[in-house]
Regions:
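Glycine-rich flavin
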Residues: 52-70, 219-221
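Flavin (primarily FAD) cofactor-binding/catalytic cores of flavoenzymes
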Residues: 2-11, 16-35, 39-41, 70-354
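Glycine-rich loop at the start of a catalytic domain that most often binds anionic cofactors/ligands
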Residues: 46
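Histidine-centered active-site microenvironments of extracellular/periplasmic hydrolases
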Residues: 49
C-alpha cells in the first residue's frame, strides 16, 4: 500500500497551483483528475470562450502563460497552457479518476473511486464547480416544451439558428452567450434578477482581480470585506459584448415568474413565447465526494481560510469567495494555493513530531 502525504482531488488550475507549491516541500503528492486529459473545466467551455484578461494577468504560479498573440486568450490556449504546465513540473496525475468518496482512516484518509482506493495523510479538494451546474427550480420548468441548455453544456450558437431564445442570467457568461446567439437567433430575451452591471469599455478582468486583492488585504487585517466598493459580477466589455451593445442586444428584462409550455410569464401578466432557454445561472461547488465525511452543508464546508474546521487534514481550494477572494480564477488562486501548501507542510511536520 502506498501512503501519499497529499492527494489532491481535481486536476484544474487550483489543483495544479497547490501541487506546484507542494513541490518545494518534498512531500509525496498525487493528483486524481476525473477528466480524460489535462486542462480542467476549461476544455468544456463553449467554442468561442475567451478570458477577459490578457495572458500576463491569467497565469498560475511559477510559469507565466505564454502570449497567444491576441488581446484575450482563447479557451484552447488556456487548455494548452494548463497541459504544458502539468508536464513542465512533472506533476503526478492519474486520470480519469472520478473520486466518489473520501473516508477517514487512522493514517488520514482513504480516497475512493468506485472499487479503487488510494491512501493519504492529507486531502485537498480542488474539484471546482463545473460538475454541479445550477438551474433554479421554477414553476413550470418541467412543462416547458422547448430546448433547455445550461451554459456548462453550451457549445456554439449553431444549435439556436432561427429560434426564439431566452438567456437567463446577468453575468459574464450570460452576456457573452447572448452576444453570439443573438447573431443567429430569430429573437432573444435576456432575463436577469437585477440589471446587469457593466465595466467601462477600457477596463478588463484585471479590475476584478484588483478588487479581490483589496478584499484579501482587508481579510488579512481583520476588516470586513463586505463594506468595500465594487463586486465581482460586473460584465467585462469584451469585443463581442461591445458589438452586441452596438446592435441594441444588451437589453435585460426582469426575471420571469413562471415557465409555461410555450415560454415565460412575468408577474405583471406579460408573456413571451420562446423556443429555447439558455441557463447562464452559475454553478455550485462540486463536493459530492466529501459527503461521506459529513461536513457538507448548503454546498459548502466550514473553513478557516482553506482548512476544513471539522476534519483535520482536509483543505478546500478554488471554490470562490468562501475559500479566498478570486480563488476560482487562474491568477487569483495563487494566494490560497501558496498558503494551503504552507499549512499542509506544517500540519504534516507536526504529525511527525507528535
Amino acid at each position: 500500500m502506498t501512503l501519499y502525504d497529499v492527494i489532491i482531488v481535481g486536476g484544474g488550475q487550483a489543483a495544479l497551483s497547490v501541487a506546484y507549491f507542494l513541490r518545494r516541500t518534498n512531500r509525496s503528492v498525487l493528483i486524481l483528475d476525473a477528466e480524460d486529459a489535462g486542462g480542467g473545466a476549461w476544455q468544456h467551455g463553449w467554442d468561442s470562450l475567451r478570458l477577459f484578461s490578457p495572458a500576463n494577468w491569467s497565469s498560475i504560479a511559477g510559469w507565466p502563460m505564454p502570449s497567444s498573440g491576441e488581446q484575450y486568450p482563447s479557451r484552447d490556449h488556456v487548455v494548452s497552457y494548463l497541459r504544458r504546465y502539468e508536464a513542465r513540473y512533472s506533476l503526478a496525475v492519474q486520470r480519469p479518476v472520478l473520486v466518489t468518496a473520501v473516508e477517514p482512516r487512522d493514517h488520514g484518509f482513504a480516497v475512493k473511486a468506485g472499487d479503487r482506493s488510494w491512501d493519504a495523510r492529507v486531502v485537498v479538494s480542488a474539484t471546482g464547480t463545473w460538475r454541479n451546474p445550477v438551474i433554479p427550480e421554477l414553476e413550470g420548468r418541467s412543462a416547458f416544451g422547448g430546448l433547455q441548455v445550461h451554459s456548462a453544456h453550451y457549445v456554439s450558437p449553431s444549435a439556436f439558428q432561427g429560434l426564439r431564445v431566452m438567456v437567463v442570467g446577468g453575468g459574464n457568461s450570460g452576456a457573452q452567450i447572448l452576444a453570439e446567439v443573438s447573431q443567429v437567433a430569430a429573437s432573444t430575451t435576456w432575463a436577469t434578477l437585477s440589471p446587469p452591471a457593466f465595466l467601462a469599455d477600457h477596463v478588463d478582468g484585471r479590475v476584478l482581480f484588483e478588487r479581490a486583492t483589496v478584499r484579501w488585504q482587508a481579510i488579512q487585517e481583520g476588516r470586513d470585506p463586505t463594506d468595500l466598493p465594487g463586486g465581482f459580477g460586473d460584465v467585462v466589455m469584451v469585443p463581442p459584448v461591445v458589438e452586441a451593445r452596438a446592435r441594441g442586444v444588451l437589453h435585460a428584462v426582469g426575471t420571469f415568474e413562471r415557465l409555461t409550455a410555450e415560454g415565460a410569464q412575468w408577474a405583471d401578466g406579460t408573456s413571451r413565447t420562446v423556443d429555447a432557454i439558455l441557463w447562464c445561472t452559475g454553478f455550485k461547488p462540486a463536493l459530492q465526494h466529501l459527503e461521506s465525511l459529513g461536513v457538507v452543508s448548503d454546498n459548502k464546508v466550514i473553513v478557516d481560510g482553506t482548512r476544513a474546521c471539522d476534519v483535520p487534514g482536509l483543505w478546500l481550494v478554488g471554490y470562490g469567495e468562501w475559500t479566498g477572494p478570486a480563488s476560482a480564477t487562474l491568477i487569483g488562486v495563487m494566494r490560497t494555493a501558496r498558503s494551503t501548501a504552507t499549512e499542509i507542510d506544517q500540519y504534516l511536520t507536526a504529525q511527525v513530531l507528535a
